[in-house]
Amino acid sequence: MRIPFTKMQGAGNDFVVLDETQGRFGLSTAHYRLLADRHFGVGADQILTVRPSPAPGIDFEYLIHNADGAEVEQCGNGARCFARFVRDQGLTAKDAIRVQTRGGVIEPQLNPDGRVTVNMGAPVFELAEIPFDATGLQPQTSGLWKKWPLALVDSGHATTVYVAVVSMGNPHAVQVVDDVDTAPVRLQGPLIEHHASFPKRVNAGFMQIVDRSHIRLRVYERGTGETLACGSGACAAVVAGIRLGLLDDTVHVQTHGGTLTISWAGAAAPVLMTGPATPVFHGEINLPDNL
């Protein structure tokens, strides 16, 4: 079957965007893996799918599949690209839309400067809802929050890291490091992602505090690996930093792919994320009917 697509990127986090507003392509997990494959497919961190409104008061449904083909709840950088795509393709005339994801409703807003702001909703701290199993763990208390110990074992070598856990529609474990350039992201990332305390796996964030309004961040994404940027990861890191008493309520997040601005007023307030969303090219790909 021949599938049209648009390649997009937001702060270096890259996506294949599919329009299923006129009908579904019927793609399998293997199809999504092939689309994301950088050697045999188009290449992307995630595959984003646009579907028609599933309910009154909602403009579109937004599906996300990671590079491993698994469907996930949320993708912040993808949400900005989603909003840019539906406007550029004439699927809506609105600057602000309401979008249903598996992780809840989000509200992207196209700004006059070309950037997109996304209301990502309020962070979730209830451990069962993240989900995070803290059985047998003794946390450290810092600021308004707790940091949880995770025992990591690789090739017989054991270490313990302390993480703050939060859901931004998808689960995140954030640790503070002295220098993101030397942080063991590729070693610890997969160990944290698959840690037994996270029954649905987790995104692992490594945050360096530059000052109270500036952090540097690397994220090892669940099902994808390290990416140039992670929007929901940036939101989770800022929320963690604020709750730990380390950050102010508006923070510039520097990633390898660009800078995002994250604002959070605390408590049950929504997290606002602002950043770029850029079309790269349009194309078509032939996919096997049965895969």
Curated annotation (Swiss-Prot):
Its EC number is 5.1.1.7. It holds the Pfam family DAP_epimerase. Belongs to the diaminopimelate epimerase family. It comes from the Bacteria. Substrate binds at N13, Q46, N66, G76, N77, N170, N203, E221, R222, G231, S232. The active site is at C75, C230. Keywords: Amino-acid biosynthesis, Cytoplasm, Isomerase, Lysine biosynthesis. The record marks H172, E221 as: Could be important to modulate the pK values of the two catalytic cysteine residues. PANTHER family: DIAMINOPIMELATE EPIMERASE, DIAMINOPIMELATE EPIMERASE, CHLOROPLASTIC. GO terms for biological process: lysine biosynthetic process via diaminopimelate. Catalyzes the stereoinversion of LL-2,6-diaminopimelate (L,L-DAP) to meso-diaminopimelate (meso-DAP), a precursor of L-lysine and an essential component of the bacterial peptidoglycan. GO terms for cellular component: cytosol. It is found in: Cytoplasm. It comes from Albidiferax ferrireducens (strain ATCC BAA-621 / DSM 15236 / T118) (Rhodoferax ferrireducens). It catalyses: (2S,6S)-2,6-diaminopimelate = meso-2,6-diaminopimelate. Homodimer. InterPro entries: DAP_epimerase_DapF (IPR001653). Pathway: Amino-acid biosynthesis; L-lysine biosynthesis via DAP pathway; DL-2,6-diaminopimelate from LL-2,6-diaminopimelate: step 1/1. This is Diaminopimelate epimerase. One of its GO terms (molecular function) is diaminopimelate epimerase activity.
